[in-house]
Regions:
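Conserved N-terminal helical subregion
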Residues: 2, 42-183, 226-239
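Glycine-rich FAD pyrophosphate-binding loop
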Residues: 2-37
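Conserved mid-domain beta->alpha element of the FAD-binding
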Residues: 9-10, 26-27, 151-152, 208, ...
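Acidic/histidine metal-binding catalytic segments
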Residues: 60-61, 246-261, 320-325, 338
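Histidine-centered metal-chelating micro-motifs
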Residues: 157-158, 177-179, 204-207, 288-289
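A short coil-to-beta-strand element that immediately follows conserved catalytic motifs
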Residues: 171-175, 191-195, 237-240, 248-266
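Short helix-loop capping/hinge motifs at secondary-structure junctions, enriched
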Residues: 184-191, 214, 227-228, 274, ...
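Active-site substrate-recognition segment that forms the wall
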Residues: 194-229, 246
Length: 352
């Protein structure tokens, strides 16, 4: 998460600018809640949040699911379930949290302000490369800005990665996701329990879990596409197009009369990078690698990045280049493992 980078590196007296695709027009802007935006925080992510002293607020704003329940998409027939509340806490020492993304952003933004970190949004920052300079500079609002360290967190479509890390190529987009949040009011009983539900289908699957916000349930539908998928950040589609794409069970389809806006997202993948560092620039989060989201590790991966980066800088405070190279080596190894498991999960979830 961009905001976690700000907080952690600020504590190490870092000088940092974060090029970002996010825009905060108003703290009270609730537009984000119209989209499916649930996230899952596992033990590693919660560890970082504890170090930021915000874990308590995150836990209070989310829920700790009791079970992982498996279903056949056809007829919503139960396959089995696994207790995860106590199992995960016993194994990893921390609980598994499901919550709304906007709530986590709000908590981190409040922490940034409390620590008096200066942050500026609505500013496009692009890389400025010159052959005779050892470091990359920032071009922003017509000005050249020099910084010791630039942390790039501008997402799967990272402009910085395209310019500076040209060797990292995108994989062909073959899958897409539909996301939205529904009130549990008119949903079947299987969605009303405090569980993560995983529904298997042929070449597709969907996941649901509570977000802790006014009884809202997060729905994420993923499927393999037969044809070309537009390489856009998101695309607004009609409810009928979504229903036609998924051919949902009639029981579930009848639960969607209140759905007015559905967004279709291309699942953008990139090749495993050899390095996520060049000169004074490092990639974090989805900017480092776009991968199949079949481990629900997007937020955790970004939180891990911020923690590892800060610790590497702390270890080598007088040798930034060495610190960044160590960060890159550690994170690339981790990304390789996450990508491998995510691709395996795709085969399992899609019954292949």
């Amino acid at each position: 998460m961009i905001l976690s980078d700000l907080i952690i590196i600020n504590r190490n007296d870092g000088k940092i600018i974060l090029p970002s695709k996010f825009t905060f027009k108003d703290e009270k802007d609730k537009a984000i809640k119209k989209e499916g935006a649930g996230i899952q925080i596992t033990s590693n992510g919660l560890f970082v949040l504890e170090k930021l002293h915000v874990a308590g607020a995150v836990i209070r704003g989310g829920l700790k699911p009791d079970n992982l329940c498996l279903f056949d998409e056809d007829g919503l027939k139960s396959i089995g379930s696994l207790e995860i509340l106590n199992r995960l806490k016993y194994r990893y020492g921390r609980s598994f949290i499901a919550l709304h993304r906007s709530h986590l952003i709000k908590i981190l933004l409040e922490k940034v302000k409390a620590e008096k970190i200066k942050i500026s949004f609505d500013s496009e920052a692009l890389p400025l490369l010159t052959q005779d300079e050892h470091c990359v500079s920032i071009f922003c609002k017509g000005e050249k800005i020099k910084k010791d360290l630039i942390v790039v967190a501008d997402g799967v479509g990272s402009k910085w990665k395209k310019i500076i890390f040209k060797e990292i190529k995108k994989r062909s987009i073959s899958q897409s996701a539909y996301r939205f949040v529904l009130s549990k009011k008119n949903l079947p009983p299987i969605f009303l329990k405090n569980n993560v539900n995983l529904f298997f289908g042929r070449g597709r699957h969907f996941v649901t879990y509570p977000t802790g916000v006014n009884g809202a349930i997060n729905f994420v539908f993923c499927k393999r596409e037969k044809g070309h998928v537009a390489n856009d950040w998101k695309d607004k589609v009609s409810k009928q197009q979504f229903l036609d794409d998924f051919e949902l069970d009639e029981t579930l389809e009848a639960c969607f009369p209140s759905v007015k806006t559905i967004y279709k997202w291309p699942i953008i993948e990139s090749g495993i990078p050899f390095s996520v560092q060049k000169k004074n620039v490092v990639l974090v989060g989805d900017a480092a690698i776009g991968m199949l989201p079949y481990m629900a590790q997007g937020a955790n991966k970004a939180l891990e990045d911020s923690w590892v980066l800060a610790n590497c800088i702390k270890e080598y405070p007088l040798d930034l280049e060495k610190a960044l190279k160590k960060y890159s080596k550690k994170r690339v190894k981790r990304l390789q493992k996450l990508d491998q498991v995510s691709r395996l999960n795709e085969k399992i979830y899609h019954l292949e």
